[in-house]
Amino acid sequence: MAEHLASIFGTEKDRVNCPFYFKIGACRHGDRCSRLHNRPTISPTLLLSNMYQRPDMITPGVDAQGQPLDPRKIQEHFEDFFEDLFEELGKFGEIESLNICDNLADHMIGNVYVQFKEEDQAAAALQALQGRFYSGRPIIADFSPVTDFREATCRQYEENNCNRGGYCNFMHVKLVSRELRRKLFGRYRRSYRRGSRSRSRSRSISPRNKRDNDRRDPSHREFSHRDRDREFYRHGSGKRSSERSERQERDGSRGRRQASPKRGGSPGGGREGSEERRARIEQWNREREEKEEGGA
């Protein structure tokens, strides 16, 4: 029974705990939800509720006076906010991800999720944010149960085909430019490189770990799933690709041991066919029989 309850915890089958709060840290029913919202007492992730106020939040693409807004100005406004927030929160420790929702529903609009490397860093930031204001509005911060943003983000939105629009109950993460992301998160990579010079063994982030971070954290992503899949299949990833490369190396080394200039393979230099192999083996057998008969 305990194993069954553990397996369905935080899923739609769980009739006790709210799956949306467990995955996203927010629920459209709020305190009126019929299921439990288990608020963590400690977490590496903080939720700053409704903190980002987009200039076109009343009507998308139009300001409060009804004038159309240039999309570039909207993005510039967002990136200024993103950088301000990153610089302030970065004082408390290393930030692994900073995600800002582009949703329009009341329980999601402007939500900011900041994930620190350590829980005590998040606790220090939470304490410092108590009673603080931003742009004349109080900052409402609390620990969030979200630690894996793959379960919280909307995959259809990342592929530009979410039919629920801004009122989707999964996170529509607004992305920053590559230059700003490199500027802010690149400082951690530089510190890793500096630290690795003083140690005999480098502890810098490997390409595989970087791919894992990109999948886990949407703020490190600036292209769609289709683009990412192209990169995935181009470079290979995971256990299958490693097994495939090992098998190819093994086959290649075996082929080098067996091949000789006199008895080369197929004319095209490629892998021999089964008929060619059989013909070559029959030729070897005939040569061996002729030698044995001659010796007799």
UniProtKB/Swiss-Prot annotation:
Residues annotated as domain RRM: 44-146
InterPro entries, alphabetized: Nucleotide-bd_a/b_plait_sf, RBD_domain_sf, RRM_dom, RRM_dom_euk, U2AF_small, Znf_CCCH
Cell location: Nucleus speckle
GO cellular component terms given for this protein: nuclear speck; nucleus; spliceosomal complex; U2AF complex
Function: Necessary for the splicing of pre-mRNA. Probably active at the 3' splice sites.
Quaternary structure and interacting proteins, as annotated: Component of the spliceosome. Homo- and heterodimer. Interacts with U2AF35B, RNU1 and SR45.
Protein name stated in the entry: Splicing factor U2af small subunit A
Organism: Arabidopsis thaliana (Mouse-ear cress)
Record lineage: Eukaryota, Viridiplantae, Streptophyta, Embryophyta, Tracheophyta
Gene: U2AF35A
